[in-house]
C-alpha cells in the first residue's frame, strides 16, 4: 500500500520509514527509526530525486508507481552514491530503463560498478555547477574595496 506526502502541488515525498534497523550506516543508534527521503517532481517531465535504502524498497516502489500514475519516469537525479540515497538505483533502472540518470562523473563510475553496467541515458553535471554562489563579477553582489 502506498504512503506518499504532498510537499507542494507538483512535488511528492515518496520515500519510506525504517523502524526496524537499530543503526544508521552500522554506526549510529536510531532508537525511533529513520526516514529515507526520495522526492518525485511531477511537471512537464518527471524527475526523481534519489532512491532509498533496500530496507524500504518495497514501500518506495509502491509509492513511485502510484505517484507516477502510469506516466514515464524521465529523469533520476543522483545526489551521491551512499546506500541511503542510491541502494535501489539498479532495480529502478530495470523497472524504468527509459529514465535518464543525472549525476556527476564520480557517481557515474560507481553506478557502472555497482548497479548498471551500461546505463542507457546519462546526463553528466559538473559538481561546481551545482554548488555555485553569486560572485561580485556576476553583478549580484557589491564589490569589496
Regions found by a protein language model. Give the residues of each.
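Conserved beta-strand hairpin/beta-sheet module of binuclear metal-dependent hydrolase folds
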Residues: 3-64
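Structured loop/turn residues at beta-strand edges in well-structured enzyme cores
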Residues: 9, 71, 117
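Active-site metal-binding motif and surrounding structural segment of the metallo-beta-lactamase
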Residues: 44, 55-102
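A short alpha->loop->secondary-structure connector
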Residues: 68, 118-121
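Anionic-ligand anchoring segments at beta-strand to alpha-helix junctions in alpha/beta enzyme folds, i.e.
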Residues: 102-103, 107-112
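Short acidic-hydrophobic, aromatic-tinged amphipathic segments that line or gate anion-handling sites
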Residues: 121-127
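Conserved small/polar residues in nucleotide/adenosyl-binding loops
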Residues: 131-138
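Hydrophobic alpha-helical segments, chiefly the membrane-spanning helices
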Residues: 143-145
